[in-house]
């Protein structure tokens, strides 16, 4: 899969997953891999910078959870600004997909 193409969809996918429920980083990575039958397989190196940017931009909020004596995880959840951004990104994505499909159909 073209990594440049995937980069443009990271925030859309992250926001979409977090609209379901709060998740921690590794859980996002495994969910993406499972739900795409391995087509999308992210490394932490690409996920965490996106999570940090979304958090800085106020789209998501992170909260550490777990026993201080054991493994703690940072769970991310969507904010209201994130819900608004997700709706806008979904609309843009739908328009883009439709436009690309039109071009591809005419090329056949």
Residues of each region from the PLM?
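Basic amphipathic alpha-helical segments that dock to polyanions
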Residues: 47-54
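N-terminal helix-turn-helix DNA-binding core of bacterial DNA-binding proteins
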Residues: 2-46
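Amphipathic alpha-helical dimerization/coiled-coil segments
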Residues: 84-108
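Beta-hairpin "wing" of winged helix-turn-helix
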Residues: 55-72, 77
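Short beta-strand/turn micro-motifs at beta-sheet edges
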Residues: 1-3, 64-65
């Amino acid at each position: 899969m073209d990594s440049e193409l995937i980069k443009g969809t990271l925030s859309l996918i992250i926001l979409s997953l977090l609209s379901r429920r709060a998740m921690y980083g590794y859980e996002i990575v495994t969910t993406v891999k499972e739900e795409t039958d391995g087509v999308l397989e992210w490394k932490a190196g690409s996920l965490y910078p996106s999570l940090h940017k979304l958090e800085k931009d106020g789209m998501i909020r992170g909260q550490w959870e777990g026993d201080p004596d054991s493994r703690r995880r940072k769970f991310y959840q969507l904010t209201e600004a994130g819900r608004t951004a997700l709706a806008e990104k979904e609309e843009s994505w739908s328009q883009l997909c439709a436009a690309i499909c039109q071009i591809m159909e005419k090329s056949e």
